[in-house]
Amino acid sequence: MNQRNMSIINSTPVRVIAIVGCDGSGKSTLTASLVNELAARMPTEHIYLGQSSGRIGEWISQLPVIGAPFGRYLRSKAAHVHEKPSTPPGNITALVIYLLSCWRAYKFRKMLCKSQQGFLLITDRYPQVEVPGFRFDGPQLAKTTGGNGWIKMLRQRELKLYQWMASYLPVLLIRLGIDEQTAFARKPDHQLAALQEKIAVTPQLTFNGAKILELDGRHPADEILQASLRAIHAALS
């Protein structure tokens, strides 16, 4: 086990059903269906645990005057960090990345509070600390090396955020498998290389030993839903 995934695991799983998988695997469809089915039986809510960089980038792009160029700047810098991790990010880029991780941690803390109140949370995505990079819901700055003291401090603080989040195991994690042809057919606006990378990495993640249900995202949606419901009822009983 390398230093990144050395996190203290909380002994009791939280009342969370996490849905993970490559884009195009059917996460959003399954998440919505599970919330609709389970909300009639128990307090159930959905929460998106991605870092929301795309949505935030869209919001920034809509700001008057500086919005569009600044939005393009942030997207290009984020892409640069992913494609050239050996080059340390600049101070502003590192801060933006760190704040995006703080936003994910804020949503995660909100999820924990809801869970303690008796809600069942259905999450689209789940943070992990085994493989760095927002693409895999891991710490983004951990992909980079070097940099000044400010960047090194942000990198360490971000890593601690992900170690903290990864220490909480969901009661069940549903992983949807998919092949690259199907994923690209469903998400033609995504880069094929990015989909291929997610398809290669996601099945290798252990999520700190969480209970994982493996399902084929190419199967009919209702078949996936019913298999998920059976596993959820077993996990909660």
Curated annotation (Swiss-Prot):
GO terms for molecular function: ATP binding. The keyword ATP-binding applies. InterPro entries: P-loop_NTPase. Gene3D superfamilies: P-loop containing nucleotide triphosphate hydrolases (3.40.50.300). ATP binds at residues 21-28. Keywords: ATP-binding, Nucleotide-binding. The keyword Nucleotide-binding applies. It comes from the Bacteria. To E.coli YghR and YghT. This is Uncharacterized ATP-binding protein YghS. It comes from Escherichia coli (strain K12). The lineage of its organism: Bacteria, Pseudomonadati, Pseudomonadota, Gammaproteobacteria, Enterobacterales.
